[in-house]
Design a protein with these regions (language model features):
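Short, conserved secondary-structure transition motifs
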Residues: 149-153
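Hydrophobic helix-and-loop "lid/oligomerization" segment in the mid-to-C-terminal part
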Residues: 1-132, 137, 142, 146-147
Length: 153
């Protein structure tokens, strides 16, 4: 019976979606707690942790962007490798920002508003510092030129 199959599939989909929501909520709480400890006005935010679920990093990064108003990247640490997902804010091209420090990455891809990045775990701190420095430089250039629509806010 197709109706019975459809109902069973819909129920299974609902269960999986509820599991995803629970994982997302848990990671969001952990990431927000970490961000509240490390954020001191940086123009980009990088958070990382071991065993963080790969499938919800982008959503959680978006929440950090909404909270802090700066580009945010969320990394899952797996041994000597960290895999991240980032989201930008406004007209800030996050892809170009990551490209400018690509020597710290193993690989990266994406577009102006969102990126995926893999880096050696040992480079996490330098990556966060250099990304912040890039964003500060971008903001200063925009101010100096009087270009309001690319200011990182």
């Amino acid at each position: 019976d197709n109706y019975g199959e459809c109902c069973a599939m819909a129920e299974a989909l609902e269960d999986v979606n509820n599991q995803r929501r629970a994982i997302e909520a848990e990671l969001s709480d952990i990431a927000k707690e970490q961000a509240s400890r490390i954020y001191h006005g940086q123009r980009a935010l990088v958070v990382a942790g071991e065993g963080w679920h790969e499938g919800v990093k982008g959503i959680v990064a978006s929440r950090l962007v909404n909270t802090y108003g700066v580009p945010a990247l969320l990394f899952t640490i797996d041994g000597d490798e960290a895999r991240g997902s980032g989201r930008s804010v406004g007209n800030v091209n996050l892809f170009e920002a990551v490209e400018s420090i690509s020597y710290l990455t193993k690989r990266f891809g994406g577009h102006g508003a969102a990126v995926g990045v893999t880096i050696p775990t040992k480079n996490l701190k330098a990556f966060a510092q250099r990304l912040d420095a890039y964003m500060q430089k971008l903001e200063k250039m925009a101010r100096d030129l009087g270009v309001q629509d690319i200011v990182v806010t």
